[in-house]
UniProtKB/Swiss-Prot annotation:
<dbReference type="InterPro" id="IPR000795">
    <property type="entry name" value="T_Tr_GTP-bd_dom"/>
</dbReference>
<keyword id="KW-0832">Ubl conjugation</keyword>
<dbReference type="GO" id="GO:0005634">
    <property type="term" value="C:nucleus"/>
</dbReference>
<keyword id="KW-0648">Protein biosynthesis</keyword>
<feature type="binding site">
    <location>
        <begin position="158"/>
        <end position="161"/>
    </location>
    <ligand>
        <name>GTP</name>
    </ligand>
</feature>
<dbReference type="InterPro" id="IPR035647">
    <property type="entry name" value="EFG_III/V"/>
</dbReference>
<dbReference type="InterPro" id="IPR005517">
    <property type="entry name" value="Transl_elong_EFG/EF2_IV"/>
</dbReference>
<comment type="subunit">
    <text>Binds to 80S ribosomes. Actively translating ribosomes show mutually exclusive binding of eIF5a (EIF5A or EIF5A2) and EEF2/eEF2. Interacts with SERBP1; interaction sequesters EEF2/eEF2 at the A-site of the ribosome, thereby blocking the interaction sites of the mRNA-tRNA complex, promoting ribosome stabilization and hibernation. Interacts with HABP4; interaction takes place at the A-site of hibernating ribosomes and promotes ribosome stabilization. Component of the mRNA surveillance SURF complex, at least composed of ERF1, ERF3 (ERF3A or ERF3B), EEF2, UPF1/RENT1, SMG1, SMG8 and SMG9.</text>
</comment>
<dbReference type="InterPro" id="IPR031157">
    <property type="entry name" value="G_TR_CS"/>
</dbReference>
<feature type="modified residue" description="Phosphothreonine">
    <location>
        <position position="59"/>
    </location>
</feature>
<dbReference type="Pfam" id="PF00009">
    <property type="entry name" value="GTP_EFTU"/>
</dbReference>
<feature type="modified residue" description="Phosphothreonine">
    <location>
        <position position="435"/>
    </location>
</feature>
<comment type="similarity">
    <text>Belongs to the TRAFAC class translation factor GTPase superfamily. Classic translation factor GTPase family. EF-G/EF-2 subfamily.</text>
</comment>
<dbReference type="GO" id="GO:0003924">
    <property type="term" value="F:GTPase activity"/>
</dbReference>
<feature type="modified residue" description="N6-succinyllysine">
    <location>
        <position position="572"/>
    </location>
</feature>
<feature type="cross-link" description="Glycyl lysine isopeptide (Lys-Gly) (interchain with G-Cter in SUMO1); alternate">
    <location>
        <position position="239"/>
    </location>
</feature>
<feature type="modified residue" description="N6-acetyllysine; alternate">
    <location>
        <position position="239"/>
    </location>
</feature>
Amino acid sequence: MVNFTVDQIRAIMDKKANIRNMSVIAHVDHGKSTLTDSLVCKAGIIASARAGETRFTDTRKDEQERCITIKSTAISLFYELSENDLNFIKQSKDGSGFLINLIDSPGHVDFSSEVTAALRVTDGALVVVDCVSGVCVQTETVLRQAIAERIKPVLMMNKMDRALLELQLEPEELYQTFQRIVENVNVIISTYGEGESGPMGNIMIDPVLGTVGFGSGLHGWAFTLKQFAEMYVAKFAAKGEGQLGPAERAKKVEDMMKKLWGDRYFDPATGKFSKSANSPDGKKLPRTFCQLILDPIFKVFDAIMNFKKEETAKLIEKLDIKLDSEDKDKEGKPLLKAVMRRWLPAGDALLQMITIHLPSPVTAQKYRCELLYEGPPDDEAAMGIKSCDPKGPLMMYISKMVPTSDKGRFYAFGRVFSGLVSTGLKVRIMGPNYTPGKKEDLYLKPIQRTILMMGRYVEPIEDVPCGNIVGLVGVDQFLVKTGTITTFEHAHNMRVMKFSVSPVVRVAVEAKNPADLPKLVEGLKRLAKSDPMVQCIIEESGEHIIAGAGELHLEICLKDLEEDHACIPIKKSDPVVSYRETVSEESNVLCLSKSPNKHNRLYMKARPFPDGLAEDIDKGEVSARQELKQRARYLAEKYEWDVAEARKIWCFGPDGTGPNILTDITKGVQYLNEIKDSVVAGFQWATKEGALCEENMRGVRFDVHDVTLHADAIHRGGGQIIPTARRCLYASVLTAQPRLMEPIYLVEIQCPEQVVGGIYGVLNRKRGHVFEETQVAGTPMFVVKAYLPVNESFGFTADLRSNTGGQAFPQCVFDHWQILPGDPFDNTSRPSQVVAETRKRKGLKEGIPALDNFLDKL
């Protein structure tokens, strides 16, 4: 099916029950791009001989060189199900042709923001797990994100060729390995999912249902239990009964699948299935999965890899595999690939699993609407999204910008959730800060062109109905990173994406030649557009700062900046880590600040959060948008807050959502509401730039104890109150034992047993500590988990490899913030050095400001 045209795709786009939007997610190097190849070659864009080597979706040169995926890439595939297979689909369908929009996403944790962007526009996910190394830290992170977005997972066990050829596992051991991975994945799903009673129903994966695939992307073969069940049903049917109708056949195959997994055994002597492991005459019976599925595969591997010519010929005939003339002369691995690919083609198995088990937009948008849309659940836009209605108002979410071949321009890449987007349509382009009824962050502009994304190429298309993924030309000037596009006047925004990592590593950049500064500024703007997570900031000292998730992420960003966006040579500083400011005790005095005109007084105290509250705010368990009483109850039950105080939270900060809280515990103050906005503004300002070195604050609760105000409104305006509030907040921080917090990575290291000692050495030198060490069952590999300060992580990978002879593979994920031990006021301590360096870098006055600047006497 190589030559399917845009018109054919366009025809299927209207059959929204036959669309599947899915992404491929996994831990780094578990083989996503390689697997995607077998799908692409099935839908016919790569020649099948090259599949497994081309990595079609790795479109950039550096992706091909480093052999990693950096940006998520979209591609549309067409697949036709046979009459027999259609009966397995439990949701509504429309004809036998399916359009699959597939997004291949990166596995490196540094690029997990790309994964988030991919997940937002898809409804299903193919989770790839390497069956040798099992479920890793990044598998868990991306799976958790997928479930939080209400995306249905199916599992693929990749790299079976390694299990057979390198580890030489027995069938029973291999079954146990699979069983363990399935259990691990289901534990993650049930931990973060909403249970069977939730809106999605049961999303646990189960080989019996056919939601688990097994195979090898590199060799291009794969199967689910369905393929083997069909072979055996056909075999048994051939013995006795005549032809079955498609519906009865589907029923028989489903029954058969139940027998092929779990504690079911097969007696080859009688040809019967049994539930006990021993036959009536006391022989030990083989498990059905091992006997009926793994055994034939092992036989093929054994015959071909040991060059048993006659046996190979017999097997090929028995399995009814038709080889090309050129394949017949091969031997060893090339022959193995050719045979397995003919017998169990990966494309078919995976595409069937995707079309049968992943939801169509019609199914998925019913339960995803409430998570996607911020507005009321019953306005026109929400109804359009829920029913995926092409006649409804246009609602579209742009999840990222894709650079075009033309420097400096971007395609806006996103998904149409309701309505129809077409060339020349006049739309409302709403950025993430838009609020209905206001004019800011809103543009009314026509769309210049709509295009289809096909991996490395784009195809122009007239219009695209809802449920599809599309690229737009001509809206990139009006959006940074993400936004909502709609034709409905009262539409609210689609919800902003939550990233699982935060940009904690920063680098200062400058142009080598000062005359190139304007190009650098322009380049930074483009960089901020092209990557969903990177932040570009200008410090007060005039420095340009780029913040990213980690070393690798920053390295790629800087390379892009130099070569694509700014096209000028760049100097960069050493990487610096962002810190947070916090307090460790309650303020020792009640802090008083007077306004500049001496007529208003504010009294406040600061105190630290109880453990875990800041993390809850980050996750969104406690947020500014929650229902008041519900939030108060949660705080009272979990953190033992006073209920009356918990109800009087004024706001969160910085930016209205951060992990600091301002509460009002005053008793009967007149005119208090009039100054609330001013105090809140001062609070946002103070929490964004803390007292120690103007870093964000974290985990501080401020209590307003008392306020005395001037009777005339004119003497208590914003100009009087905002700076006063800020001074008072600073004073309460400085009297509450202020501390610095540093970001900590969770490092997962895979290594053979003999080098574990070397790892401990490296970690101890870098202030890290190991908190878990486990052996991967059935292999000689160890997994070491440790906490490592981000500050010490630069060059960690190189250091680790040189100390372990290149046998250890680390994965760093940002995990939490931790207080840096020591007092910033003590000149010999580590925090005071950090404060001094940071203040110097930002061009602030030397030394922490004295308390007298903020605290007033009565």
